[in-house]
A protein has these predicted regions:
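The feature captures the beta-strand-to-loop junction immediately N-terminal to the Walker
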Residues: 34-36
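Helix-to-loop junction immediately C-terminal to a conserved catalytic motif
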Residues: 49
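Conserved ABC transporter NBD signature motif
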Residues: 57-69
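Conserved ABC ATPase "signature" region
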Residues: 103-121
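Conserved ABC ATPase signature
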Residues: 125-129, 133
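A short, proline-enriched helix->beta-strand linker immediately N-terminal to the Walker B motif
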Residues: 144-148
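Catalytic Walker B motif of ABC-type/P-loop ATPase nucleotide-binding domains
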Residues: 150-153
Length: 167
């Protein structure tokens, strides 16, 4: 087993958002969490990413309990959070910069720019890209983190149908 969530619960301002959520995700599985706006999808991802603390419940990766932020997870929030003063290649390679392996990160990123529909935009700035291209850059940045588990919040929200199907 790769990921296990047990009895996850959280409420905000006396409103129960998640209550006793249990699930498992096996290695190699892709899981989509669907539901109406406000039902707790983003909240669950924020808890898994270590950005929010649940009231109770546990998270396990390979049977080891995980608390807070963990290198097991790479999180892509709904907003792309691209740094406006950095080029797309520099934004995509932030993980490499943090971990002092920028040249390796750039090599990996450049190989994926075409796959993500970003070829030719390596030196562009975020404000020069469409919303869909910004979203793809954020997705690529997350994919390059070398995490075991990708947590993607609305990864295809700003993409047109053709690009969504290609991804």
């Amino acid at each position: 087993m790769k990921l296990k969530v047990e009895k996850m619960s959280i409420s905000f301002e006396q409103r129960q958002i998640l209550q006793d959520v249990d699930f498992q995700v096996q290695k190699g599985e892709f899981v989509a969490i669907i539901g109406p706006s406000g039902c707790g999808k983003s909240t669950l991802l924020n808890i898994l990413a270590g950005l929010l603390e649940s009231e109770n419940g546990k998270v396990f990766v390979d049977d080891a309990e995980v608390h807070g932020i963990s290198s097991h997870f790479a999180y892509m929030p709904q907003n792309d959070l691209l740094l406006p003063w950095k080029t797309i290649i520099d934004n995509v390679c932030l993980y490499g910069k943090i971990h002092h392996c920028v040249s390796d990160a750039k090599k990996k990123a450049l190989k994926e720019f075409e796959t993500f529909g970003l070829k030719g935009y390596e030196n562009a700035y975020p404000n020069e890209l469409s919303g869909g291209m910004r979203q793809r850059a954020a997705f690529l940045r997350t994919a390059l983190c070398d995490a075991d588990i990708l947590l993607l919040d609305e990864p295809f929200g700003a993409l047109d149908v053709i690009t969504r199907n290609d991804m």
